[in-house]
Amino acid sequence: MDLETSEISNYKSSVVLSKLASNEQHGENSPYFDGWKAYDNDPFHLVNNLNGVIQMGLAENQLSVDLIEEWIKRNPKASICTNDGIESFRRIANFQDYHGLPEFTNAIAKFMEKTRGGKVKFDAKRVVMAGGATGANETLILCLADPGDAFLVPTPYYPGFNRDLRWRSGVQLLPISCKSCNNFKITIEAIEEAYEKGQQANVKIKGLILTNPCNPLGTILDRDTLKKISTFTNEHNIHLVCDEIYAATVFNSPKFVSIAEIINEDNCINKDLVHIVSSLSKDLGFPGFRVGIVYSFNDDVVNCARKMSSFGLVSTQTQHLLAFMLSDDEFVEEFLIESAKRLRERYEKFTRGLEEIGIKCLESNAGVYCWMDLRSLLKEATLDAEMSLWKLIINEVKLNVSPGSSFNCSEVGWFRVCFANIDDQTMEIALARIRMFMDAYNNVNKNGVMKNKHNGRGTTYDLTPQMGSTMKMLLA
């Protein structure tokens, strides 16, 4: 009997594709990425689509892009595609080795020093390029672990780690459970508990991964916590990977403390076990340039990562431009100050708007997002209830926010909402939508039911007509 067309297609796929290509570890079906799809299908626009989905699920720092644009206008020689810079075209366009342009790695090392307050020095010879922080994280994991090995990761953590750290490496991520009762702070007790669980399951634990500043919390790790964690990893002879890609987004005190400071202060810590991931995507707002950095204190890791970097090099044209820019000390200093100022102002304005509506966020001082507490809106403290609320916000309120479950949060009802990738008008419209949503929610609580405009039975918040008139008023 002939096979159906779909059966033939499935059969061919199972034969042709590798196990890697057909596994489900990438994480693209997570609500985190589903929210992006909702935005892509109906993107908000101030002129062309006022009722579209507002993108608040993308952790981009667009508040100071104008400063970058102005610098580029003033420095045409930085680009090999201008009359002023064409003299460098032949040298830059030719094949380069995997170490990167010397002027680029030197500039990166200097920039890492500046974003850490000048308290530590970085060696340009230890700077290894990668295709964004995604490539840098995967490169490190491939250097440090084998398939089946595991890394401890505090929750909540960046959803992309499932792709970056697990998908192609076969490495496991073991959660360190952090709770809202202490503002999701990492404790040694929680680390020890996660470590013991891994040991009991006969899992080989190779290291611990930190994001500092934290995505999605927007908080930083204090010096004492970093010391305790580095002592723990040192005593257990496991690696400590510190993802510091948000280092320059700290906009309020306390100041950022890099793991590099900690190991410089404590000679008992084995530096060979400590590694840093850096990037320009968040600090400068260059996610499209795909500039990721592996910085390791371990010579063998540096050498191995450099070999692997051939699969994800930063283009020499990009290196050339950034070497010019990051070597402009006056500009970099002014940019970092102004960027922090704008992030602080946007954070304060956005969280104040939420607070006026009755929504609280975890207090934070870094990053480009807030950790929003919507637990009071859940019908029950379950994952299903969180997903129902999230779908309501996506489909009816038309805001792409990310549910806490996609960050492996140990508690339901928390959502990450990004505030630095939209302009002021769009932010005001987003707040207006949230306000109307909360009014509708409060009306339900008061009257017991909210009518669905189509069938009168109830549970759908159809706010679009109200939003349309409100947004026109905001834009007037």
Curated annotation (Swiss-Prot):
Lineage top rank: taxon: Eukaryota
Q: What induces it?
A: Associated with fruit ripening, but unresponsive to auxin treatment in vegetative tissue.
One of the entry's Gene Ontology molecular-function terms is: transaminase activity
- Reaction catalysed? S-adenosyl-L-methionine = 1-aminocyclopropane-1-carboxylate + S-methyl-5'-thioadenosine + H(+)
Question: Pathway listed for it?
Answer: Alkene biosynthesis; ethylene biosynthesis via S-adenosyl-L-methionine; ethylene from S-adenosyl-L-methionine: step 1/2
Query: Which co-factors does it depend on?
Result: pyridoxal 5'-phosphate
Q: N6-(pyridoxal phosphate)lysine-modified residues are where?
A: K282
Cysteines paired by S-S bonds:
none
Instruction: Give the enzyme's EC designation.
Output: 4.4.1.14
Cite the Gene3D superfamilies for this sequence.
Answer: Aspartate Aminotransferase, domain 1 (3.90.1150.10), Type I PLP-dependent aspartate aminotransferase-like (Major domain) (3.40.640.10)
Q: Does the keyword S-adenosyl-L-methionine apply?
A: yes
Q: By its UniProt entry, which Pfam families does this protein fall under?
A: Aminotran_1_2
Does Lyase count among this protein's keywords? yes
Keywords on record: Ethylene biosynthesis, Fruit ripening, Lyase, Pyridoxal phosphate, S-adenosyl-L-methionine
Task: Offer one example of a GO biological process linked to this entry.
Answer: amino acid metabolic process
Functionally, this protein is described as follows: Catalyzes the formation of 1-aminocyclopropane-1-carboxylate, a direct precursor of ethylene in higher plants.
Indicate the family of this protein: Belongs to the class-I pyridoxal-phosphate-dependent aminotransferase family.
* Quaternary structure annotation from Swiss-Prot or TrEMBL: Homodimer.
This protein is called what? 1-aminocyclopropane-1-carboxylate synthase 4
Q: Could you tell me which species this protein originates from? A: Solanum lycopersicum (Tomato)
